[in-house]
Design a protein with these regions (language model features):
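Short glycine-dipeptide loop
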Residues: 129-135
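A short, conserved alpha-helix within the catalytic core of class I
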Residues: 109-124
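Class I SAM-dependent methyltransferase Rossmann-like catalytic core
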Residues: 1-35
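Conserved class I S-adenosyl-L-methionine
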Residues: 136-199
Length: 281
């Protein structure tokens, strides 16, 4: 299990993934900007290596500390003289950080860790955070959506098979159920396909397919529907945190990538939802 998870996380260091993450560095920074400043110590949990984001944070005079299990990322951080913490150091940290930031990480913990592993991980983070500190979670999620059926049309025949390949993989991995395909009067699927399903299923399809097939093996195992009850269950209830704020993020840099695969004029759901959790003092 640990080997599989390590390989998965190492895949996040590939060039395509890092380029996309760096493209959205400004959005990652905006989610925490108001909390930063002198005498603030920030842990970027599951940091990856995003030089532009790190530069933005350190320019506020915040003490930035990265944490990532990837040996490749750790080497990049070390080569660039960026402060990072090891697993052993984090396990022994107590009341050390003012802010713990998880950007596009919570859904991975939900997808890859067992229940006991999650419990242990969040207890570790709780110990590392100062009293009255803040956990900020920025992750996938359609926000408050209804269970009503909606539809999405694939952009062209050129990408029809690619989108369908994603759907089959997501179904195989129990991330979604198979959506309905719109047919003509003779019950033949209309090409390019139009899919009908609930909002959460369409959200999963859209934001997975946008990565391209090179990311299929990795991303098709992950659910992108993060909703507040999961945060309540795993952090708030066991550790006494309160969600003080949540807001939707619409990152327009995703639009041209989405339009390659789907006929849309704008982004129909948030690209991320940002949750702020306050620890009891």
């Amino acid at each position: 299990m640990n080997q599989i998870r390590s390989e998965h996380l190492e895949n996040h260091t590939n060039k395509t993934y890092q380029e996309r993450m760096n493209q959205t560095a400004s959005s990652k920074f905006r989610a925490i900007a108001k909390h930063l400043g002198e005498n603030v110590k920030l842990l970027d949990f599951g940091s990856g290596f995003s030089p532009e984001f790190i530069k933005q944070v350190t320019q506020t005079r915040t003490h930035y500390v990265a944490y990532d299990v990837s040996q490749i990322v750790q080497s990049q951080l070390q080569e660039n003289n960026i402060d990072f913490i090891t697993k052993e150091q984090l396990e022994n940290a107590e009341d050390e950080f003012d802010i713990i930031y998880m950007s596009s990480v919570f859904h991975e913990l939900m997808s890859y860790l067992s229940r006991p592993e999650r419990t242990k991980k969040f207890a570790m983070l709780d110990r590392a955070l100062k009293p009255d500190g803040t956990i900020i979670i920025r992750d996938w999620g359609p926000g408050e959506t209804s269970s009503l059926v909606t539809s999405i049309e694939v952009a062209s025949e050129d990408v029809n098979d690619e989108v369908y390949t994603w759907i089959k993989a997501l179904v195989k991995n129990s991330v979604i159920s198979m959506p309905n395909i719109v047919c003509d009067d003779n019950d033949n699927p209309i090409v390019p396909y139009t899919y009908k399903a609930n909002n959460q299923t369409i959200y999963e399809i859209m934001f997975h397919a946008v990565w391209g097939l090179d990311s299929l093996e990795r991303e098709s195992k992950e659910s992108y529907v993060i909703v507040d009850h999961l945060i309540h269950k795993w952090i708030c209830a066991p550790h006494g945190y309160k969600i003080t704020q949540s807001q939707n993020e619409f990152d327009e840099t995703y639009l041209p990538h989405l339009q390659k695969y789907f006929k849309i004029d704008n982004i129909p759901w948030p690209t991320k939802v940002i949750y702020e959790l306050k620890k009891k003092s």
